[in-house]
Regions:
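N-terminal lobe/hinge region of extracytoplasmic solute-binding protein
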Residues: 107-163
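Ligand/substrate-recognition segments at binding pockets and active sites
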Residues: 109, 299, 460-537, 609
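Aromatic- and charge-enriched surface segment that lines or borders ligand/interaction sites
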Residues: 157-206, 392-394
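Surface-exposed binding/hinge segments that line
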Residues: 207-269
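Gly/Pro-rich hinge or "lid" segments in bacterial periplasmic/extracellular proteins
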Residues: 255-313, 320, 447, 452
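Ligand-site clamp/hinge motif
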Residues: 280-283, 307-353, 506, 515
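Detector for C-terminal structural segments
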Residues: 309, 404-436, 488, 492-497, ...
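Append "and occasionally in soluble cytosolic enzymes with long acidic Gly/Pro-rich linkers
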Residues: 393-498
Length: 645
């Protein structure tokens, strides 16, 4: 049996990207082997601890270790993230093993997560990375993309842009495509998906500025029109979409060009408000155009997939895929025993598995980041947009900046994660080489600067208890929400609180503890008024356009921070003017500076993803792009019946 294991790195992916999320594998010194950052998975070294006689370290003990590598003991020294070049990866990006591929086999694909999956298996409705990892196997978007993230015309459809005419013409590349139930795929299924997301009763999170940019969408969404005037069907296999403005990100994977298809022959007869609970979304009747289809489901635990005989690229090379949720406590020992063939390895245990002989390792820079953000308003459902509250507790950007300077991300990245994790200077991560600004000022660890900022802004300790009061002398107490992941995460969150206290800020955990991930995001999305700031993580896909995460109408804009200046910059990034490469770079640099200055969110950690590949897997790579992909699940081949041990 072939087994794959994928670490569930982040809880959320951006609104237009459904992708596998490979977690970071981090080496660390012996004394800090069980530490891990706020969203990364942690697995205890069962065998190692038995051998060395180690017990679980308490939160206090972990906090002491963190302080030793970058807490109070270094409070006088600033560490630097700004203008730091992209480091080399620890391993190659691909591996080829000896042997002749066998025919078929069963692939066991484990999603490492502390919580069960929700079971929403529809691209248009899925909103967390666990469901999305499953959904991407049973459905495909229309377009493929190359290693520069740009759309190609090699997928289900091709696209032709007319920038001056403000249109995109989408044409299916064949008249013979079929859904997994054998029914034909036509352009009506593409149009139907656009209409579904634009429907006023749509329950998902993907209705955003990209869809509102289609001519006539506003009237359709409000119910004034029964169709979208800007969606012009040309024939059964092509459509011309008219936009209010052309955006450069239309050319990118996960960008602002709609890419989903929905089987109209199924969902047109089901009220849209009932889709999420239907058997076609929750059960075994799911229909898509991906390489697999669902055979059986154990709710929250596992999904068994079999090949889609109508998949347009041909039959899967394996006979079956079992995708199951796996506890983070067992990953390393199971890989060591040969129980899984491909594993996105946990950050905390590099020393425990780096010398394994039954696997090879490959690396990639992950398109994701950890962050801390501030709750500054609410999402107004009636208006369909984020409303910033000027009187929010965290409305002062100086207070937010001071909090950012108080955290030593490089210390945790270097000492805890042995350099495979690090701080970064920008909300645009370095993997977006074309628009990332290496010279952007970052929030380098500088507690003295944090204290000075707070002093100058009037946040002073007026009663001698070591904690600062508000400018008016009233008590300043800040509630901080974070996800429950593992003991290492709990320890790092406690260290955050110590770093905050070091600069005189009374910041406590919301409810006094971390929250289970689904509850955490439920509270954040509901704009719980008791939450002032929170730590999360984003898998951001291949389009750096900030509109979907920080736009005025973006439901994923969890901080709810909007402003005329920010809207203007986002508008320029998405404008026709930005088709000019120099202008595009200029606008993205403006955005990076603006986010830094306003500090409504700041990145904490970025890093490298390391994957273990069992030596019976013929070939595996970690490079981006689907045009010439060789490592999608349906393409993987095995060279033996049993795993190498």
């Amino acid at each position: 049996m072939w087994q794959i294991i994928i670490m569930n790195e982040l809880d959320h992916v951006d609104s237009n990207t459904i992708e596998l999320t490979w977690s970071f594998c981090i080496q660390r010194p012996l004394w800090s082997l069980i530490f891990l950052s706020s969203s990364f998975e942690m697995i205890y070294l069962e065998d190692f601890m038995k051998k060395k006689g180690l017990l679980f370290l308490s939160t206090a003990a972990v906090a002491v270790t963190l302080a030793a590598c970058g807490g109070k003991g270094q409070s006088s020294d600033a560490t630097t993230t700004s203008a730091k070049p992209q480091p080399k990866m620890k391993f190659a990006s691909e591996v080829t093993h000896d042997g002749t591929p066998i025919k078929g086999g069963t692939l066991k694909y484990a999603i490492v997560s502390p919580a069960p999956f929700k079971g929403v298996f529809m691209d248009e409705l899925a909103s967390d990375s666990v469901d999305s990892q499953i959904t991407t196997q049973i459905d495909n978007t229309l377009f493929e993309f190359d290693d520069n993230r740009r759309l190609t015309n090699t997928g289900l459809a091709s696209v032709e842009f007319d920038v001056e005419g403000k249109t995109a013409t989408v044409k299916l590349n064949s008249k013979d495509y079929k859904f997994s139930d054998g029914q034909p795929l036509t352009i009506d299924d593409y149009i139907f998906a656009i209409e579904a997301i634009g429907n006023k009763d749509y329950t998902g999170v993907r209705y955003n500025g990209n869809y509102q940019n289609i001519e006539g969408m506003d009237k359709f969404h409000s119910g004034e029109a029964s169709s979208i005037s800007g969606v012009e069907k040309l024939d059964d296999y092509s459509v011309k979409i008219h936009f209010k403005q052309m955006r450069p990100s239309m050319q990118l994977a996960g960008g602002s060009l709609p890419s989903y298809v929905l089987p109209k022959h199924i969902f047109s007869s089901i009220p849209i408000t009932e889709w999420e609970k239907s058997e076609y979304v929750r059960g075994t009747k799911g229909v898509g155009v991906g390489p697999f289809k669902i055979e059986s489901i154990v709710p929250g635990e596992s999904v068994t997939l079999v090949p889609n005989e109508h998949f347009y690229k041909g039959h899967s090379k394996v006979d079956k895929v079992v995708m199951e949720v796996v506890s983070p406590d067992t990953v390393v020992s199971q890989v060591k025993s040969g129980n899984y063939d491909i594993a996105s390895m946990p950050n905390s245990q590099f020393e425990a598995y780096k010398d394994l002989t039954n696997v090879s390792f490959i690396s990639s820079f992950a398109s994701q980041y950890e962050y801390i953000a501030f709750h500054l308003g609410k999402f107004d459902k009636e208006q369909g947009k984020n409303i910033t509250d000027p009187n929010a507790k965290m409305s002062d950007p100086v207070l937010r900046q001071a909090i950012a300077y108080a955290i030593d991300n490089n210390a945790s990245g270097e000492s805890i994660f042995n350099g495979l994790q690090r701080g970064t200077n920008s909300i645009i991560i370095p993997s977006f080489k074309d628009v990332y600004n290496p010279n952007q000022e970052g929030f380098d660890y500088n507690p003295e600067k944090a204290k000075q900022l707070l002093d100058d802004a009037g946040y002073k300790d007026t009663d001698g208890d070591g904690l600062r009061e508000n400018k008016d002398g009233s008590k300043l107490s800040i509630n901080f929400a974070a996800r429950t992941r593992d003991d290492a995460n709990e320890a790092l969150i406690q260290q955050y609180l110590l770093w905050f206290k070091e600069v005189g800020l009374d910041i406590k955990l919301y409810t006094g503890r971390t929250l289970e991930p689904s509850l955490f995001y439920e509270k954040i999305q509901a704009d719980d008024p008791e939450i002032d700031m929170f730590a999360g993580g984003w898998g951001i896909g291949y389009d750096p356009n900030p509109a979907n995460l920080f736009g005025e109408t973006a439901k994923f804009n969890f901080s709810r921070f909007v402003s005329p200046e920010g809207n203007e910059i986002i508008g320029k990034i998405g404008s026709t003017e930005a088709f000019d490469e120099a202008k595009n770079v200029e606008f993205f640099q403006q955005w990076q500076k603006y986010v830094h200055d306003q500090a409504f969110i700041f990145p904490t950690l970025i890093g490298e993803s390391v994957t273990a590949v069992n030596k019976r897997v013929k070939f595996m790579n970690s490079e981006i792009g689907t045009k010439d992909a060789k490592s999608e699940l349906y393409q993987i081949e095995l060279v033996s019946e049993t795993s190498a041990k």
